[in-house]
Amino acid sequence: MKKGFSAITVLSLSFLFIIGTGCQDSGTFAVAGKTGTLGYGGELIVGLGSDIDVRAGINKLDFDVDEIDIEDIEYDFKANFDTMSGLLDWHIFDDSFHLTGGFYSMNNEITLDGRPTKSVDIGDISYTPNQIGSLKGKAEVDGLSPYLGIGWGNPMRSNRRWGFTLDLGVIFTDSPDVTLSSYGGTYSSDPTFLAELEKERQKIEDDLDVIQFYPVASLGLFIRF
């Protein structure tokens, strides 16, 4: 997790160092506020030459939902997504449309607290709510992930000092790491129950193996200085 954030920080600082001369020559840069599937955040944009822009950004998405009933287990759901980005835009065909490539440092976490309302299967065995107690699950995706996308909007070459941008793309992530534990139940420390709980955790992790991408759709409002 820390390695991912360190890598993207170094990448972003490198971009800013490289483009320093360009900023001095043009005297312009832009900042943008963003909202979309990554939550809310902001970007710093600087132009490199006539058709290349570099962006460094940060986004945050937090939300929670209480008392979701799934297969006789009542869950409280919480999501905390933190991302940092280093992106390069290549403007082709016209000044607005662009192809984008780069990296996102992801620190995304989903936690679930579950309370069975009746007997449920854990692994291959059925257990009562009293035996299970409460279940705590966590799915995490972190590290540095590549990004490819397209977009519209050119903060550095727009006729106006302010305007809108649109980005559509995909972050190619690792599959989530899953943890699952029980507390407050009569079987919470029972070796057989813990073995079945590990089977359940592995099944969930296997089911989530197909999730190796994160869709990005974001709308931005920029101001050029």
Q: Where are the language model's segments positioned?
A:
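Outer-envelope beta-barrel architecture signal
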Residues: 23-29, 50-52, 95-97, 144, ...
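Membrane-embedded beta-strand positions of outer-membrane beta-barrel proteins
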Residues: 31-33, 44, 54-56, 88, ...
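Hydrophobic, lipid-facing positions within transmembrane beta-strands of outer-membrane proteins
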Residues: 29, 38-42, 52, 82-86, ...
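Outer-membrane beta-barrel "beta-signal"
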Residues: 89, 93, 212-225
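Transmembrane beta-strands of outer-membrane beta-barrel pores
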Residues: 35-39, 58-64, 103-109, 154, ...
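Extracellular/periplasm-exposed beta-strand and loop segments of Gram-negative cell-envelope proteins
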Residues: 58-86, 108-145, 174-216
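Outer-membrane beta-barrel strand-turn architecture
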Residues: 48-50, 92-94, 154-158, 225
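Cleavable N-terminal export/targeting peptides
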Residues: 1-26, 209-210, 225
